[in-house]
Amino acid sequence: MSDIEARVRKIIAEQLGVEESQVTNEKAFVADLGADSLDSVELVMALEDEFGIEIPDEDAEKITTVQSAIDYANTHQKA
């Protein structure tokens, strides 16, 4: 597991109040991990803070799974 993947999983677990072991790449935030719309907004904000990035609303709407969050962080993180 890459450093970015580990950081994303930790943030998701903390934001959604689930065990990190439940946060697997194929899980969807709403359907599998019980997130609501406020959780999703807070999760995006936490990812922005952690990786020093700004996630536009149109991109945030597409981040719906653990893997999509990891992929976005990998692609957009600041060096």
From Swiss-Prot:
Q: Which Gene3D superfamilies does this one have?
A: ACP-like
Where in or outside the cell? Cytoplasm
Metabolic or biological pathway: Lipid metabolism; fatty acid biosynthesis
Q: Which UniProt keywords apply?
A: Cytoplasm, Fatty acid biosynthesis, Fatty acid metabolism, Lipid biosynthesis, Lipid metabolism, Phosphopantetheine, Phosphoprotein
GO cellular component annotations of the record: cytosol; membrane
User: What does it do?
Assistant: Carrier of the growing fatty acid chain in fatty acid biosynthesis.
Protein known as: Acyl carrier protein
| Source organism of the structure | Verminephrobacter eiseniae (strain EF01-2)
Gene behind the chain: acpP
